[in-house]
């Protein structure tokens, strides 16, 4: 199990309140299986993995926002394509 110091992660994010928000978002992504860990799991809990990713500079609020925007755009494009295919089938 890797040892994570919150102070190291706080320095990467800026303050402890934003750290909690970013770590919680990332841990939730990992927990539901939406994303794969960017660091070895080493039998750690998802919150520890999220903190290790933050500590190593692999994840921050801007990165999470950009990834979520990209995923949303991809989902919207897929939905639009599906609607177009349905509309074409009715003609």
From Swiss-Prot:
Gene3D superfamilies cross-referenced by the UniProt entry: 3.90.940.10
Listed EC numbers: 2.7.7.6
Keywords: DNA-directed RNA polymerase, Nucleotidyltransferase, Transcription, Transferase
GO terms for cellular component: DNA-directed RNA polymerase complex
GO term, biological process aspect, one: DNA-templated transcription
Top-tier EC class: transferase
Catalytic activity: RNA(n) + a ribonucleoside 5'-triphosphate = RNA(n+1) + diphosphate
Any one GO molecular function term: DNA-directed RNA polymerase activity
InterPro entries reported in the protein's UniProt record: DNA-dir_RNA_pol_omega, Pol_omega/Rpo6/RPB6, RPB6/omega-like_sf
Functional note: Promotes RNA polymerase assembly. Latches the N- and C-terminal regions of the beta' subunit thereby facilitating its interaction with the beta and alpha subunits.
Subunit structure comment from the entry: The RNAP catalytic core consists of 2 alpha, 1 beta, 1 beta' and 1 omega subunit. When a sigma factor is associated with the core the holoenzyme is formed, which can initiate transcription.
Family of the protein in this entry: Belongs to the RNA polymerase subunit omega family.
NCBIfam families named among the record's database cross-references: rpoZ (TIGR00690)
Protein name as catalogued: DNA-directed RNA polymerase subunit omega
Species assigned in the record: Proteus mirabilis (strain HI4320)
Gene giving rise to this polypeptide: rpoZ
